[in-house]
């Protein structure tokens, strides 16, 4: 098999707003995998979520600010924002695999809250046909059915790989980072902002500045 040419880490999300939990997830896996690029993908119209509060343009600007100090090349991918129909991660992974070719390692990064609902995602098991999946787990959470759906736990156990294997193979492996998850809720942040609070411990300073300058998340 031809050797892997490069490693691209993908971080998708609504980022409404992007917060320190997202940044911590990226920081951890950038240090672990040393990818050649971190590609951040703000969601367009996610099929599971109703009514993003900030516009695509505002969310892109906040993401750009939040990830400006990364020790890796960061690119903001607009494909989901530009997609006119409902957004499915499987479609994004197919498109990126087609773009990068068969010999790139593609690593999809996932937060603990996403992992808990992965079995409801469109064609979730086929995501491994196009990428590796690296996920955070909440502090103290074991890989068990109480916290992670049984079929997801089984798939992760069956596919578990080392960081080195993930970095040097194209797709198909899984990695769970225990005790990584930072318990920050975008919903709670929006509620705090609507009350006029400044959640400085939960948001990158540049993101909070942007929110205040553009009067986002006001009732």
Curated annotation (Swiss-Prot):
Please provide, alphabetically and separated by semicolons, the GO molecular function terms listed in this UniProt record. Answer: ATP binding; nicotinate-nucleotide adenylyltransferase activity
Q: Name one GO biological process term.
A: NAD biosynthetic process
Q: What class of enzyme is it?
A: transferase
Instruction: Tell me which Gene3D superfamilies the record gives.
Output: HUPs
Which pathway is this protein engaged in?
Answer: Cofactor biosynthesis; NAD(+) biosynthesis; deamido-NAD(+) from nicotinate D-ribonucleotide: step 1/1
This enzyme catalyses: nicotinate beta-D-ribonucleotide + ATP + H(+) = deamido-NAD(+) + diphosphate
Write out the entry's keywords from A to Z: ATP-binding, NAD, Nucleotide-binding, Nucleotidyltransferase, Pyridine nucleotide biosynthesis, Transferase
EC annotation from Swiss-Prot or TrEMBL:
2.7.7.18
Pfam families in UniProt: CTP_transf_like
HAMAP family reported for this sequence: NaMN_adenylyltr (MF_00244)
Family, as annotated: Belongs to the NadD family.
Q: What does this protein do?
A: Catalyzes the reversible adenylation of nicotinate mononucleotide (NaMN) to nicotinic acid adenine dinucleotide (NaAD).
Q: Which NCBIfam families match?
A: nicotinate (nicotinamide) nucleotide adenylyltransferase, PRK06973.1
Protein name (record): Probable nicotinate-nucleotide adenylyltransferase
Gene label = nadD
């Amino acid at each position: 098999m031809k050797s892997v040419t490069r490693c691209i880490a993908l971080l998708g999300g609504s980022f409404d707003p992007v917060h320190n939990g997202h940044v911590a997830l990226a920081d951890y896996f950038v240090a672990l995998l040393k990818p050649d690029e971190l590609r951040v993908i703000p969601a367009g119209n996610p099929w599971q979520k109703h009514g993003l509060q900030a516009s695509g343009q505002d969310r892109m600007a906040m993401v750009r600010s939040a990830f400006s100090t990364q020790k890796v090349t960061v690119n903001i991918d607009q494909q989901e924002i530009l997609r006119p129909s409902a957004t499915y991660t499987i479609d994004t992974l197919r498109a990126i695999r087609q773009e990068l070719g068969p010999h790139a390692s593609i690593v999809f990064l996932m937060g603990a809250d996403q992992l808990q609902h992965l079995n409801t995602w469109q064609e979730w098991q086929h995501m491994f046909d196009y990428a590796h999946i690296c996920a955070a787990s909440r502090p103290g959470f074991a890989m068990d059915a109480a916290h992670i759906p049984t079929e997801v736990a089984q798939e992760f156990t069956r596919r578990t790989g080392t960081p080195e294997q993930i970095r040097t193979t194209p797709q198909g492996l899984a990695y769970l980072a225990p005790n990584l998850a930072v318990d920050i809720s975008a919903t709670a942040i929006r509620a705090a902002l609507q009350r006029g609070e400044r959640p400085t411990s939960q948001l990158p300073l540049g993101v909070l500045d942007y929110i205040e300058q553009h009067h986002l998340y006001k009732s």
